[in-house]
């Protein structure tokens, strides 16, 4: 039997296989147990029917998988990161605790589980075409955040609640570690943030890339999270700088655009006075210098009363 199952209102959300290093087993044995000993077609483990995520854990490390598929089951690390290479978990300051104490002290608590269900877990849809037959198929993947993604979003959101637009931030992700989804989660959560007086902290979230066209992966990630029409405006290669001007001057909550469009409208955005912006920059190392970035800052701070927060990735 599965070692541990967490339910919310009768629905299985998380399963866990637990191993004890001092007994000669570790997290890799837990992963192997999921791959070889567990029936992925059972009601509890069947993809999109059973539990949302499956954790393999020992006393030092945690791995996760959202789609069990026998020996092909792919597990990703769900660790806090440790040292320069970022692998594993740090030694706890409190020596009475384990390296994986964050799981039951944070991740498995009621508030965090509800937050994950409400704001993070989603179905990623992508269209794949058979190169031989030309038949297109919609592929669906259940996305559960890795620990570093959840941590980055929560830390910025909690700080923004206090400081609003008075600070800027930098998120560092290694290649292939899910930067695109981190941007998508952050843009949606920031668009709903309110202060103590129930006023919106931001009027508009601008997700910006320095590529000539909006990155398709970034575009799809943000659109996959939207449940309301009219909330997001993606300014792809068919849109002009004037479309960007209209979106910023209007009431669109999330605008996805290229940085180049700002150069043509920086002197024309007049209705943004008293507006508050959050600017999420994709590939910041290539974007935060030069005339394009100066145009962005000029456009969004055109008024003495408008303000912008910049989050670079």
What does each model-found stretch correspond to?
Residues 1-204, 213, 217-229, 250-253, ...:
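ATP-dependent helicase/translocase motor core
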Residues 44-51, 230-241, 309:
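A generic structural motif
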Residues 55-56, 255-258, 304-313:
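Structural recognition of the conserved hydrophobic beta-strand(s) that form the central parallel beta-sheet
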Residues 57-58, 209, 281:
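Short beta-strand/turn micro-motifs composed of small residues
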Residues 145, 207, 312:
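Conserved SAM-binding loop
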Residues 212, 234-243, 259-264:
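Conserved helicase motor
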Residues 214, 261, 286-287, 312:
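Residues immediately C-terminal
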Residues 272-306:
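SF2 helicase catalytic motif II
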């Amino acid at each position: 039997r599965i070692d541990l199952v967490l339910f919310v209102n009768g629905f299985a959300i998380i399963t866990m296989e637990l191993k004890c290093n001092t007994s000669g087993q570790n997290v890799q044995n837990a992963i192997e147990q999921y791959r070889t000993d567990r029936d992925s077609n059972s009601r509890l483990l069947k993809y999109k029917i059973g539990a949302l995520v499956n954790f393999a854990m020992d006393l030092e490390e945690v791995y996760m998988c959202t789609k069990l598929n026998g020996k092909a089951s792919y597990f990703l690390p769900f660790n806090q990161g440790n040292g320069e290479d970022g692998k594993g978990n740090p030694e706890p300051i409190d020596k009475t605790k384990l390296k994986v104490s964050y799981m039951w002290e944070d991740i498995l608590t009621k508030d965090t589980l509800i937050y994950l269900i409400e704001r993070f877990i989603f179905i990623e849809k992508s269209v794949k075409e058979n190169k031989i037959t030309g038949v297109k198929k919609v592929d669906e993947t259940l996305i559960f955040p890795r620990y570093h993604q959840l941590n980055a979003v929560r830390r910025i959101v909690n700080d923004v609640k206090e400081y609003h637009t008075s600070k800027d931030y930098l998120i560092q992700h290694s290649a292939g570690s899910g930067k695109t989804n981190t941007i998508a989660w952050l843009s949606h959560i920031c668009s709903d943030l309110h202060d103590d007086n129930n006023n919106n902290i931001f009027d508009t979230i601008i997700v910006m890339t320095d590529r000539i066209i909006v990155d398709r992966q970034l575009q799809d990630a943000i659109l996959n999270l939207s449940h309301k029409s009219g909330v997001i405006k993606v300014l792809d290669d068919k849109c002009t700088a004037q479309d960007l001007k209209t979106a910023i001057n209007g009431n669109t909550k999330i605008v996805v655009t290229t940085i180049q469009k700002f150069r043509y409208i920086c002197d024309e955005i007049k209705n943004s006075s008293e507006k508050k912006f959050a600017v999420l920059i994709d590939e910041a190392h290539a974007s935060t210098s030069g005339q394009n970035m100066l145009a962005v800052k000029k456009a969004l701070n055109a008024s003495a009363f408008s303000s912008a927060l910049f989050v670079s990735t």
